[in-house]
Design a protein with these regions (language model features):
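A metal-dependent, Asp-based hydrolase signature
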Residues: 39, 48-98
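N-terminal cap/leader regions of alpha/beta-hydrolase-fold enzymes
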Residues: 103, 125-126, 137
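A short, Lys/Arg-enriched amphipathic alpha-helix followed by its capping loop at the start of a domain
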Residues: 32, 36, 40, 113-122
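Long amphipathic N-terminal alpha/beta scaffold segment
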Residues: 93-112
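Active-site neighborhood of HAD-like aspartate-dependent phosphohydrolases
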Residues: 2-49
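Asp-based, Mg2+/Mn2+-dependent phosphohydrolase catalytic module
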Residues: 1-8, 111, 115, 119, ...
């Protein structure tokens, strides 16, 4: 379905795992943590414990690298029954810091597609992402994509209220905005609930806390290649 008959004014993009790879870096750190804790626990136990710790910390710490790092250390203390050494703690902290520096190279077709959307001039392009402000700003800057966007908003959670607030800030109705993202839970479901159009582009890895049941909707289109956005929005 093309959206040419709709009064679309804004195209909003998620950042992590939509514009650049992110989750695989976290998965690599999780695996290295498992190696460090081998004397005390299996990789499966470390992974299960980390997920439970992250979920338990979510209300206080929210999403982002710093929250992940705290959970990484907290889980390690639990897994080792307090026997963890200072050297391992320092290594875990350094692994967490590495997630603030990894290269945010654009995923296939992202840069070219954004350039064509930008050059077309009919749509306002914005980034709507979840996490820590400084970290997300740094990732966008490192990606080399910042020049395509007129606005970036980073929130602690993506729910219906946040989508309504974004539309109000941009001066558009929900049915005048398209949300593009990889997470059905954060990028698609709440956007659909408030009346936005959505484009779902799944990624090959999904964070455990982002998994949810998917469903069809008349305002939802699912794509496998980023450049398909151009056809949906009738950009040549």
């Amino acid at each position: 379905m093309r959206l040419t008959d709709q009064e679309i004014k804004v195209v909003a993009f998620d950042a992590d795992d939509t514009l650049w790879d992110c989750q695989s870096w976290f998965d690599d750190v999780e695996r290295e943590c498992g190696e460090l804790l081998k004397p005390w626990a299996t990789q499966e136990e470390v992974t299960k414990g980390l997920f439970a710790t992250e979920r338990g910390n979510m209300e206080l710490l929210g999403y982002g690298t710093k929250a992940f790092t705290i959970s990484l250390v907290e889980n390690a203390v639990k897994m080792t029954h307090g026997e963890i050494t200072g050297d391992i703690v320092l290594r875990l902290i350094e692994l967490g810091k590495s997630l603030l520096r990894f290269p945010t190279n654009p995923l296939p077709e992202v840069k070219e597609t954004l350039k064509r959307l930008y050059d077309d001039g009919r749509y306002r392009l914005v980034v709507f992402t979840k996490g820590e402000l400084l970290d997300q700003e740094s990732k966008l800057k490192r990606s080399g994509l910042a020049g395509f966007f007129e606005y970036m908003e980073t929130v602690s959670n993506k729910g219906m209220d946040e989508y309504v607030a974004l539309c109000e800030h941009l001066g558009v109705s929900p049915n005048e905005m398209v949300m593009v993202g990889n997470s059905f839970r954060s990028d698609i479901a709440p956007a659909l609930a408030v009346g936005c159009y959505t484009i779902h582009i799944p990624y090959h890895v999904v964070w455990e806390l982002e998994k949810t049941e998917e469903y069809p909707h008349e305002h939802l289109q699912k794509i496998s290649a980023f450049s398909e956005i151009l056809d949906i929005l009738s950009v040549k």
